Regions:
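Class I S-adenosyl-L-methionine
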Residues: 1-105, 109-113, 134
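Short, glycine-/small-residue-rich phosphate/pyrophosphate-handling segment
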Residues: 110-140
Length: 140
């Protein structure tokens, strides 16, 4: 079965990349992500595809069955306001689980990193996201 690994790369700083993420990136035969993310891994010798659009990524993977071990780069953590969720849902729907196994490797989220820098616990933090939204949350 072919492998797709959604890899959380944290803040993009190689010093904060997890060892599991590093190993996954180094073992890929295809690495996919936004250009700015791929540029951080220019030393990797596998093929690359620059995109952050779920439809384009799904199409590319399905049109290139020669790749056996695919890595998708996501900023931060794959489970915290991540594009990994929409990719996983859409790809599973389109591919129907016939050839690919999808797994996730977590990264350091901006929230945990920020709280660590401020030396505050984040277990009682209220989280809202304004990313891509026009709602005036600050004024309410």
């Amino acid at each position: 079965m072919k492998q797709i690994t959604c890899i959380g790369i944290g803040l993009g700083n190689p010093d904060t990349l997890t060892i599991a993420a590093k190993h996954a990136i180094e073992s890929c035969d295809l690495l996919i992500g936004a250009s700015r993310m791929l540029s951080s891994f220019s030393h990797v010798t596998c093929s690359t595809f620059a995109s952050c659009k779920t439809n384009e990524i799904c199409d590319y993977i399905l049109q290139h069955p020669e790749y056996q071990n695919i890595g998708l780069l996501f900023s931060g953590d794959t489970g915290f306001y991540s594009g990994a969720k929409s990719f996983t849902n859409q790809f599973k729907h389109r591919e129907q689980g016939q050839e690919y196994e999808i797994k996730h490797i977590c990264g350091i989220s901006s929230l945990s990193y920020f709280c660590a820098k401020l030396q505050i616990p984040w277990d009682d933090v209220t989280i809202i996201s304004l990313h891509g939204r026009e709602t005036p949350w600050i004024s309410t």
